[in-house]
Amino acid sequence: CLSVIGAKRLHIPIFHMEAGNRCFDECLPEETNRRIVDVTADVNMCYSEHARRYLNAAGTPRERTYVVGSPMAEVLHDNLEQIKASDILERLGLEKGKYILLSAHREENIDTEANFFNLMNAVNAMAEKYDMPILYSCHPRSKKRLEATGFILDSRVIQHEPLGFHDYNCLQMN
């Protein structure tokens, strides 16, 4: 976000991809950053007409907002062969359609003790209710919190280091 201010002062054009996306949670630093970049950008590239309308209603001139769509479909399409070729299911001994994939690492879920315990208790309850493996792509923040609290996850919860793009998307697809 600070680089945008420096670029603006140096008269470097700023193009903001994902412009107008909002979660409306002012506690998240990303929300503040989005608003600053939206206002500062010379060109705001929105994923949807909804995001564009939001920016225009907030005062961003229409001539600085463009709906370009999400690049995610293109990224997935361009990587589909590598995603399908991933052998992550075999490496982890998982069966297609017979596991739950979990990623939980946001500050508000992990760093607030009550939220963390509520989340981990819910994970354990899911493991018990569905009686299937839960693959937890455990980010450093989460791992540190688990170790610090000594929280015991259900034996069906498999903690794994963060996964790469192809492996993670393969797991999501299966």
PLM feature segments, named:
Residues 83-174:
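Donor-nucleotide binding loops and adjacent catalytic segments primarily
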Residues 2, 54, 75, 144-146:
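Phosphate- and divalent-cation-binding pockets in alpha/beta enzyme and binding domains
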Residues 14-20, 69, 102-106, 137:
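Short beta-strands and strand-loop turn motifs
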Residues 24-29, 76-77, 167-171:
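Short, charged, surface-exposed secondary-structure boundary motifs
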Residues 37-115:
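A nucleotide-sugar donor-handling region in carbohydrate enzymes
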Residues 15, 45, 66, 135, ...:
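Hydrophobic/aromatic beta-strand patches that form the interior of the parallel beta-sheet core
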Residues 18, 48, 69, 161-163:
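Residues at the C-termini of beta-strands that transition into short coil/loop
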Residues 1-61:
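Active-site and donor-binding regions of nucleotide-sugar-utilizing enzymes
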